[in-house]
């Protein structure tokens, strides 16, 4: 940046490792004095709080802003390297095309994971022998979550995600966001836009046609330059359904998000021969010839695609800017009127009503059988659904300040604020729809430009039934099918169906909320902390570290629930600080409750392995946020035994445990002599022969193990009378249900909870969980007599809350969590990951309750 008057360096914040995260602004020198004005024009158009005449004027005065990034996944090395080449060309070339781009476009060039690049490059260059260089790093390439850093862009847990979202949705509001990735589908060079169905039903159709336009510019340029191998549409697995990725969350903000996945590596690479990819089709119009593929060629493709997008922005700048406004304006209009989103379930409702009231006519010729009923269904059936007021979208949501876990609701609101959502706060008590709300409640109206994101965070996703052919296997979503954040976090939000107003003040865009704690009430005996509030555990951990004794009630008494924390008056100072910091409202106690038991911090071991586990990393981050002390435990330490000397509780979250059928747990295994000594303790895998006996011994001696997801296979290795509930009998033999009968990709389901169990203190009788073909258990008839009891289960044939659940009727009475007495110790097994991606705040307590002794 110091060497070019076309480039300005900015830091957008610190990473999780404390590095500055860089953003380069690239444009013509003459544009820099007006940069703040162009930025403000983009923000005004994006928020759409101006008239159409103003929008047209600003669209002609402004300059389109294009975001180009790379390096998010550090092992995908093309992404970071193309940034360097693109920077060089834009900063140094003087051809007519480059100069025109610089004159007409504001380019934001961003490295989105500098920590990861440092980790990966240092590791790759470490061996002097070039033939031994590799990318098999011993740790995750983002401090906590590795590859899942591209699953964090509506929650914004990680610092890098927050930095990026604040730039995209609060500061700059680019019209196009281009996110470089690897690797392309086998037999191709690169996958890009447009993408396959389904696309999400809540965003504006101009997003889809905008993707078509940008995609056409990209593929046309590659073809003009004789660069084959661009896969699109159903030529790749990528869709526009899911929210949460760096290039998908922009769709919900009226921005055109571009993903490409390209091949290439510094090590020798070749395009493989895939016969089906040799045939030109709409998904791959210009097939590439298989054979050796130099890394430099991938960089050239990437720069060409960058230039294609920038040229598109030059030629269609005013259109991009005006459409940005138009999508926002239409969102505001939809939020101010009765609006029905066209979900698949509503189309199915129309068909069901029609079929139930109309005598079907058999197709009387081949044409009608093929094309269907050309005359359609009478319009009255449309009105039966799309004039039904119960099926309207809400006009807004109210998060009452008197809900049990309001601090978690504030965290939810901060996730929205980081994404540029407009939030209001009530300055006094008010009434809406006959219900009274206290001062300090928060309001999120849908009459705002980023309405699609608001709807997506509060309302269920309705993924279509998507199969390869009728009766065939499912087409797997690229990531989740449903994710409604309000459900995952367990917040209480009232859906308001009519227009409303009140004593509301707007929160400044992007300004995060601080929890509002209360002063401690007068009490000479002590205080209670509510176990329903997640941050009560944070306060308890602060108290325990301050050497203050803490107790838990064992039964409910009046307004004090079972599992409440009792803090003696000696802890007043620390508790007062915690209440202010975390937004807590401790209540006064008259004295120590009868039967209350003292709790102490457990010595916690969190399992991980060489290369890093993302679910373990998320759990590591969560426990740090809530102030739990812990140590990481690796396979060799487990195999070495004597676990009880160091740990009271062991956590196994997600992969790593050998499967129920035996074998080895997850984890890549380099040769010991090929890695530095400081990583040797991380080597090894859990095995049935060595690891399971040590875990069993730990349990039998009084230890506690908590497992979630795939790690629940431990129950099988221990010989517990627990089996897979999702099976059928075929020819007298038990087998797992096939995908045409049962398939539930990442979706939110509702389970019943045993609130009397101590591991469930603070939970309600129902809880929403993130479920992704997760383990579901069946307890044998003798299980109860052996000290095994269910903690949570599916109570209905239709537990789906958000997403896609084909064959969900099979889930009824399936157990989602259980506890088992093993000798003097206890095993907890949770089929769903109760810590999922740091989003599932509604089930964090199921982990936290097990972390004391």
Please give the residue ranges for each predicted region.
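Feature marks short, surface-exposed loop/turn motifs that line or immediately flank catalytic pockets
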Residues: 115-116, 184-186, 266, 658
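Short, solvent-exposed turn/loop segments enriched in Gly/Ser/Thr/Pro and often Arg
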Residues: 109-114, 124, 179-187, 711
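Mobile, glycine- and charge-enriched loop segments
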Residues: 102, 107-109, 113-158
